[in-house]
Amino acid sequence: MAIKGLEQAVENLSRISKTAVPGAAAMAINRVASSAISQSASQVARETKVRRKLVKERARLKRATVKNPQARIKVNRGDLPVIKLGNARVVLSRRRRRKKGQRSSLKGGGSVLVVGNRRIPGAFIQQLKNGRWHVMQRVAGKNRYPIDVVKIPMAVPLTTAFKQNIERIRRERLPKELGYALQHQLRMVIKR
């Protein structure tokens, strides 16, 4: 029954205005795309324990228009440098200090670098040649350059979250949003 009403509304709108139906479609598509971005960002933030804002700003939305009713979501799936998590500080561990003459894996008397809410043992902060500051760590097994930037892998969580959520949200929300957008366009046309 709802589909018949929707078809009739589309037909009436297309008689009145040429751009009303494509405008409603573009509006619905943009709403669905932006909700897919926000839900996927929330899911990835929970999985990786990174602030949602940092995840969300990696997704870019090219909005749908009347002439081109396709929204395009572009996601930066590169690893996230740990320095972006927040302030970095060195915290002294409260463990008992080693006795004189004993060796310990914890150099510097047991201090640990904490960035945001993550503890990174054996890490240090350094300015690179390009002028950026990064959290670095010694990497075992790398002969030539044995230090590397500490990063959080984001490719797998971002890919899985976006693939799951885009399909699900398109199925669930697009018909509703299309109905709302058509009603909105109808109100706009009637007001004129």
UniProtKB/Swiss-Prot annotation:
Q: Which UniProt keywords apply?
A: Host cytoplasm, Late protein, Viral tail protein, Virion
Query: Which is one Gene Ontology cellular component term of this protein?
Result: virus tail
- Read off the InterPro entries from this record: Phage_lambda_GpZ
Q: Where in the cell is it found?
A: Virion; Host cytoplasm
Please give the family membership noted in the entry: Belongs to the Lambdalikevirus tail completion protein family.
Briefly, what is this protein's role? Stabilizes the tail structure and acts as a connector between the end of tail and the portal vertex of the capsid.
State the name under which the record lists this protein.
Tail completion protein Z
Per the UniProt record, the source organism is: Escherichia phage lambda
